[in-house]
UniProtKB/Swiss-Prot annotation:
Domain PCI: from-to ranges: 242-420
InterPro entries assigned to the protein according to its UniProt record, in alphabetical order: PCI_dom (IPR000717), PSMD12-CSN4-like_N (IPR054559), PSMD12/CSN4 (IPR040134), RPN5_C (IPR040896), WH-like_DNA-bd_sf (IPR036388), WH_DNA-bd_sf (IPR036390)
GO cellular component labels: cytoplasm; proteasome accessory complex; proteasome regulatory particle, lid subcomplex
Name under which the protein is recorded: 26S proteasome non-ATPase regulatory subunit 12
Keyword Nucleus among record annotations: no
Cross-link Glycyl lysine isopeptide (Lys-Gly) (interchain with G-Cter in SUMO1): where in chain: 92
Cross-link (Glycyl lysine isopeptide (Lys-Gly) (interchain with G-Cter in SUMO2)): 92
PTM annotation (N6-acetyllysine): residues: 221, 368
Chain's role: Component of the 26S proteasome, a multiprotein complex involved in the ATP-dependent degradation of ubiquitinated proteins. This complex plays a key role in the maintenance of protein homeostasis by removing misfolded or damaged proteins, which could impair cellular functions, and by removing proteins whose functions are no longer required. Therefore, the proteasome participates in numerous cellular processes, including cell cycle progression, apoptosis, or DNA damage repair.
Protein's organism: Pongo abelii (Sumatran orangutan)
Subunit structure: Component of the 19S proteasome regulatory particle complex. The 26S proteasome consists of a 20S core particle (CP) and two 19S regulatory subunits (RP). The regulatory particle is made of a lid composed of 9 subunits including PSMD12, a base containing 6 ATPases and few additional components. Interacts with ERCC6.
Family membership: Belongs to the proteasome subunit p55 family.
Keywords annotated in UniProt: Acetylation, Isopeptide bond, Proteasome, Ubl conjugation
SUPFAM superfamilies referenced in this protein's UniProt entry, alphabetically: Winged helix' DNA-binding domain
Amino acid sequence: MADGGSERADGRIVKMEVDYSPTVDQRLPECAKLAKEGRLQEVIETLLSLEKQTRTASDMVSTSRILVAVVKMCYEAKEWDLLNENIMLLSKRRSQLKQAVAKMVQQCCTYVEEITDLPIKLRLIDTLRMVTEGKIYVEIERARLTKTLATIKEQNGDVKEAASILQELQVETYGSMEKKERVEFILEQMRLCLAVKDYIRTQIISKKINTKFFQEENTEKLKLKYYNLMIQLDQHEGSYLSICKHYRAIYDTPCIQAESEKWQQALKSVVLYVILAPFDNEQSDLVHRISGDKKLEEIPKYKDLLKLFTTMELMRWSTLVEDYGMELRKGSLESPATDVFGSTEEGEKRWKDLKNRVVEHNIRIMAKYYTRITMKRMAQLLDLSVDESEAFLSNLVVNKTIFAKVDRLAGIINFQRPKDPNNLLNDWSQKLNSLMSLVNKTTHLIAKEEMIHNLQ
């Protein structure tokens, strides 16, 4: 603390009254020697007596040294019960100095890493988590211990318990923790939530990360981990447009751009997922922005596929499968396939969705160029049955992608949007004015011609 002040457990700031450094300098080597001779209990009693004096005098440095010495001697003697007992005792002493407890906990955290016996390690972690609970000044140490415990639980196959333990931490509120470490903790929470298929909690946790953080230096690994986790989350949600955006973020990462194979795979995924996304203004805008990427020249098949969806022409599904099916699903030596249309249940579902996007594209083209069309003719153009065509059409109308009215008895679809009466009247008035102006001009020209001919 500033000006030699120390903070007690009750929050009071106190100044050192007596400096016990010379006494501690003398006693600690003596105690260490006695501890090695097997007189540990006697040594601890001596140090606890000295600790009371230093604590009462608010000598933070000396108190810290004594607390660290006690746990160190217990650790070196492998007296695990005594170690846990003294950690609890020293942290709960009346008016204990916060900085001294923090030093002791930090020392014990190094022992957690060194201990190989699992039951002993778990007991020490539990003790340390107990003494650090609710104490802001050791919140970072508690977070690290909790992460270690979660890792052990996961390694033992108890992933659900690991996720539950790590979710206790609200690291986004830890002001003393570095931003990078906070993000690492949150990503680990996301990973474990996904592992136990807790997608709602994963979505909530993901919002704790501000993506602007990834613009900072040395954050590329964390950025890739974050977006890969988000892709897994949105795969479950079936949000293709979000997945496309995540792949774009991966594609724009310098370490991905540096390797041709990696950026090509990322760009292929960007193209495929933007095509798979249902049509709306945002999707349309993204398609045109992606189309402008010059690097698409290096993956021509994917560039041509994207162009099909921006060209105002009908597509035949059978032709698309013939031209692009092998490239998209199996790939080639020069251009490996992505996992988008892999031989999995999800891959098959996305392949079916691609066919749906082709049908929807074709219906939008018809709505653009036709005012009316029969159901049979539309089904013929779509290579579908009449019922399937009607189902697709209904879906697009419900989503307000197009406007259409179906006369079931006549079997005719009308794509022409009914005009507002006011607009209709305004159009009629404008056209009538235009016609009358034309008649007046024509009359004037005729009169002019007659006058010229009369003069002659």
